[in-house]
Design a protein with these regions (language model features):
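C-terminal membrane-cytosol helix-exit motif in multi-pass small-molecule transporters
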Residues: 171-190, 206-218, 235-250, 441-451
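12-transmembrane solute porter fold
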Residues: 8-23, 28-30, 43, 227-239, ...
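Transmembrane-helix bundle of Major Facilitator Superfamily
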Residues: 1-183, 318, 327, 333, ...
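Alpha-helical transmembrane segments
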Residues: 82, 204-209, 338
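Interfacial loop-to-helix junctions that mark the boundaries of transmembrane helices
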Residues: 45, 98-106, 162-169, 195-198, ...
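Short loop segments and helix-boundary regions at transmembrane helix junctions
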Residues: 5-8, 128, 184-202, 223-226, ...
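Flexible interhelical linker loops that connect adjacent transmembrane helices
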Residues: 178-206, 248-266, 325, 389, ...
Length: 468
């Protein structure tokens, strides 16, 4: 096969792997009321259907990228797709809440293995700047549209078949990705296991995150100042402190401390976590609001979010890139975040009697336009000062904070809103808190990301082969 054709087909394969991950990050949202009814979840514990996935995904991203450097990225990618596919089938057969949570955790672990090496595979396959930009545009489109597409697919499958099929749908996609990936993706020469894998660091950070989220999720039942909540959160902070101490002393740490000194990466990563908190809350709470508060079916809920999906796709198809070249990434990012704040504010003030059109429709269109305008600038700015030798580490760190921050934010906002309000008022409070999170992201951009509004590129400070 022609080498150039093989590279582009390999890109399609890894994008299918990423699409499967993004679909599954949101496809369960519209099915949550059905899952809650069938498996007996409480309202607070229902967030674990989402958070078990997100915590495992975020907790193992860094170590997945490192293992890919050591033993080969194709091996890790295919292992992740295999585990994700098997866990999806297991989740589909779940007959109890505990079984589903375990399945979702394993899905997150498989997703982290494959996602942790995808960017490194793309960077290695596409070494010329123009080609790499084209490849990353395709990858960004998959990230931007995949999660929203999951809402529509979840609604259709839940309404016309049953909620179990939101997991079974991954089987044909996973099998195709495994077969084509083994054929098309070239293996990199691993550094060897003698370089060391920071498994202790991965265990510490994952345990810290899970304890923290569990403490927040159960705070509604035990109280925010109860020994149960304070003990779990304190243990989480203690494990986090041990993790930081360990990483500062290891020769080959999971997260080298030098990464924390890159201003643009830290600022953009913080803004990204706050942004995705708002988006996670919108899709999670919005699905419950439309079905419980307005009586929508699962499929109708998916259709209600379709304007958001379409606007994200439209903006990510090239419009955002052209606007960024014209006005700069920082200006476009600020406009996008402002649009999301406005959309969430509209949703928080939409009374129970407000019709879908024009109020909710306008909010969902504005939300999609804002999100589609924010993703590419955030990715661009976050990597603008990261040396290419640390590109994988930088992108992995950003993804970890985004996923885990979003999961913690979702758990916190859901817990706070349900403990302080009931019925429609709880939904309203959740939207207000989500809007405040995105507004905080805008403040971070204004205060921290003081980059010039010109094209921002990754600094070519190391050979491509060193990219992690």
């Amino acid at each position: 096969m022609n080498a150039n054709l093989r590279r582009w087909m390999a890109l399609v394969v890894v994008c299918f792997g990423q699409l499967m991950i993004m679909l599954d990050s949101t496809i369960v949202n519209v099915a949550l009321p059905y899952i809650q009814r069938d498996l007996g979840f409480s309202q607070a514990n229902l967030t674990w259907v989402v958070n078990a996935y997100l915590i495992a995904y975020g907790g193992f991203l860094l170590v997945a990228g490192r293992v890919g450097d050591l033993i080969g990225r194709r091996k890790v990618f295919l292992a992740g797709v295999f585990l994700f596919t098997v866990a999806s089938v297991g989740s589909g057969f779940s007959q109890g809440a505990d079984n589903l949570i375990v399945g979702r955790f394993l899905q997150g672990l498989g997703g982290s293995l494959s996602a942790g090496v995808i960017i490194a595979i793309i960077v290695t396959e596409f070494q010329r700047p123009a080609e790499r930009a084209q490849a990353m545009s395709v990858f960004t489109l998959v990230i931007a549209g995949g999660g929203s597409l999951g809402l529509l697919a979840g609604g259709f499958l839940t309404e016309w078949i049953n909620w179990h099929w939101i997991f079974f749908i991954n089987l044909p996609i996973g099998v195709a990705t495994l077969v084509l990936g083994a054929w098309l993706i070239e293996e990199n020469e691993g550094l060897g296991l003698s370089q060391g894998v920071d498994l202790l660091g991965a265990v510490l950070i994952t345990a810290s995150l899970m304890l923290g989220v569990y403490g927040i999720v159960t705070a509604t039942d035990y109280g925010w100042t109860s020994p149960h909540t304070l003990g779990l959160v304190g243990a989480a902070l203690g494990l986090l402190a041990v993790f930081v101490l360990l990483e500062s002393r290891l020769r080959n740490p999971l997260m080298p401390m030098r990464i924390l000194g890159i201003r643009s990466l830290m600022g953009a990563t913080g803004a990204r976590a706050l942004l995705f908190t708002g988006l996670f809350v919108n899709f999670f709470v919005g699905a419950l609001y439309l079905q419980h508060g307005r009586g929508y079916s699962a499929f109708e809920t998916g259709l209600a979010f379709l304007p958001t999906t379409l606007m994200i796709g439209v903006m990510s198809s090239g419009i955002a890139a052209r606007l960024m070249a014209r006005v700069g990434p920082r200006n476009l990012l600020m406009a996008g975040l402002a649009g999301i704040v406005a959309a969430l504010t509209i949703l928080s003030n939409a009374g129970p009697a407000a019709g879908y059109a024009p109020v909710l429709l306008a909010a969902y269109v504005l939300l999609g336009a804002g999100a589609g305008s924010s993703f590419l600038p955030l990715l661009t700015i976050s990597m603008s000062e990261v040396p290419l030798r640390d590109a994988g580490l930088g992108s992995g760190f950003s993804n970890v904070v985004m996923q885990v921050g979003g999961a913690l934010g979702l758990a916190s906002i859901t817990s706070i809103s349900t403990s302080h309000a009931q019925g429609y008022a709880a939904f309203q409070m959740a939207y207000v808190l989500a809007a405040l999170c995105v507004a905080a992201a805008l403040v971070v951009v204004l205060a921290v990301l003081r980059t010039r509004n010109t094209d921002v590129v990754i600094r070519e400070q190391a050979p491509v082969e060193e990219a992690a």
